[in-house]
């Protein structure tokens, strides 16, 4: 069977991977294309650590880890972290930065479905941040994340809602007006309504625990978590 068409490798959009490969060398540039990820990372990390009851000593999987911004920060909290991504260049950048920082993270180039086939039920925490909107079959990713976490373990998702406001904010505003991210980063058709994500979660062993919005204020140039999931949102689930 062709590897690209096998059940564990089907869920790859090579055009999406190419977008991030092209800018991978600037992943850790605090003023570059990934500046927004660096800015929101403390909020994401804080939310994950608080909702999971801390990360120290836990086995954590970061799905769609890219250049390792979140993965490294979770390792700094004392977690044993594995980072998954299908982009070769982002993983090379992640490995080099971890080496330079003296941080231990195990980076692996494979799909989450492939990883789930080999490591089911092995993680205390699974994170999947800003990744679902970049794959052909996001429901398959949700299913695999559920398979990977231990009973009672925590799974976190973050993505973008699909509506007019999110198109204005995340595409028109962020890409074309404020130029916070490169043009073409997002495709509003791939955004995911909270009800859709919760529907996929309900078809797994996961149970919704909490949902919050991630909000950007262009006047103060700051981010915060809070009610309202019209644009960016995060979901905490727990394995039954």
Swiss-Prot record:
Binding site for S-adenosyl-L-methionine: 44, 64, 85, 129
Matching Pfam families: Methyltransf_23
Species name: Escherichia coli O81 (strain ED1a)
MF terms in GO: 2-polyprenyl-6-hydroxyphenol methylase activity; 3-demethylubiquinol 3-O-methyltransferase activity; polyprenyldihydroxybenzoate methyltransferase activity
Catalysed reactions, semicolon-separated: a 3-demethylubiquinol + S-adenosyl-L-methionine = a ubiquinol + S-adenosyl-L-homocysteine + H(+); a 3-(all-trans-polyprenyl)benzene-1,2-diol + S-adenosyl-L-methionine = a 2-methoxy-6-(all-trans-polyprenyl)phenol + S-adenosyl-L-homocysteine + H(+)
Cysteines engaged in disulfide bonds, as pairs: none
Function of the protein: O-methyltransferase that catalyzes the 2 O-methylation steps in the ubiquinone biosynthetic pathway.
HAMAP family found in the cross-reference section: UbiG
EC id: 2.1.1.222, 2.1.1.64
Entry keywords, A to Z: Methyltransferase, S-adenosyl-L-methionine, Transferase, Ubiquinone biosynthesis
UniProt key word S-adenosyl-L-methionine: yes
Alphabetical list of SUPFAM superfamilies matching this protein: S-adenosyl-L-methionine-dependent methyltransferases
Database matches in InterPro entries: SAM-dependent_MTases_sf, UbiG_MeTrfase
NCBIfam families per UniProt: UbiG
Keyword S-adenosyl-L-methionine: yes
Family, similarity comment: Belongs to the methyltransferase superfamily. UbiG/COQ3 family.
Pathway info: Cofactor biosynthesis; ubiquinone biosynthesis
Transmembrane residue ranges: none
Protein name: Ubiquinone biosynthesis O-methyltransferase
Superkingdom: Bacteria
Gene Ontology biological-process annotations: methylation
């Amino acid at each position: 069977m062709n590897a690209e068409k096998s059940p564990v490798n089907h869920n790859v959009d090579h055009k999406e991977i190419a977008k991030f490969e092209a800018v991978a060398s600037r992943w850790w540039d605090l003023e570059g294309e990934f500046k927004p990820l660096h800015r929101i990372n403390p909020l994401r990390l804080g939310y994950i650590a608080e909702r999971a009851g801390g990360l120290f000593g836990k086995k954590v999987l970061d799905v769609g880890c890219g250049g390792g911004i979140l993965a490294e920060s979770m390792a700094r909290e004392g977690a044993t972290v594995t980072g998954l991504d299908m982009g070769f260049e982002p993983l090379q950048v992640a490995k080099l930065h971890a080496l330079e920082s003296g941080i231990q993270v195990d980076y692996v180039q494979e799909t989450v479905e492939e990883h789930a086939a080999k490591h089911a039920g092995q993680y205390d925490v699974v994170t999947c941040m800003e990744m679902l909107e970049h794959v052909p079959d996001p429901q398959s990713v949700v299913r695999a994340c559920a398979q990977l976490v231990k009973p009672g373990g925590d799974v976190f998702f973050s993505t973008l809602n699909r509506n007019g406001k999110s198109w204005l904010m995340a595409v028109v505003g962020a890409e074309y007006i404020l130029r916070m991210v490169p043009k073409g980063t997002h495709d509003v058709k791939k955004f995911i309504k909270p009800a859709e994500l919760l529907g996929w979660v309900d078809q797994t062993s996961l149970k919704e625990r909490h949902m919050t919005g991630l909000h950007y204020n262009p006047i103060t140039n700051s981010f915060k978590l809070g009610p309202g999931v019209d644009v960016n949102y995060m979901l905490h689930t727990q394995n039954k």
